[in-house]
């Protein structure tokens, strides 16, 4: 994923958390906010409660790859944050991918044409 499509700054995360719409399932929480651009910016958060750094990094890599492969299905113009819950530690790639798609559908962010 290109650097321009990433949420990295603390102020960007705070803005999304403050003015967001959110939804959750057993693996993830999603926060979205319209950003005024013609592309999405995405951030991934994994708390220290989830596990040690190796585990957190693995979960972030799985989240990133799941989103990257399904990015063309997602409507553009949003800041999106995915927050991993403790149950992500034991989840497979397919479970994480289906959780991401489930939340994106619930938030009406999946293009109907794809």
UniProtKB/Swiss-Prot annotation:
Gene3D superfamilies: 3.30.230.10. GO terms for biological process: tRNA 5'-leader removal. Its EC number is 3.1.26.5. It holds the Pfam family Ribonuclease_P. Signal peptide: none annotated. Keywords: Endonuclease, Hydrolase, Nuclease, RNA-binding, tRNA processing. It catalyses: Endonucleolytic cleavage of RNA, removing 5'-extranucleotides from tRNA precursor. GO terms for molecular function: 3'-tRNA processing endoribonuclease activity; ribonuclease P activity; tRNA binding. SUPFAM superfamilies: Ribosomal protein S5 domain 2-like. It is an enzyme of class 3 (hydrolase). InterPro entries: Ribosomal_Su5_D2-typ_SF, Ribsml_uS5_D2-typ_fold_subgr, RNase_P. GO terms for cellular component: ribonuclease P complex. The keyword RNA-binding applies. Consists of a catalytic RNA component (M1 or rnpB) and a protein subunit. RNaseP catalyzes the removal of the 5'-leader sequence from pre-tRNA to produce the mature 5'-terminus. It can also cleave other RNA substrates such as 4.5S RNA. The protein component plays an auxiliary but essential role in vivo by binding to the 5'-leader sequence and broadening the substrate specificity of the ribozyme. Belongs to the RnpA family. This is Ribonuclease P protein component. It comes from Alkaliphilus oremlandii (strain OhILAs) (Clostridium oremlandii (strain OhILAs)).
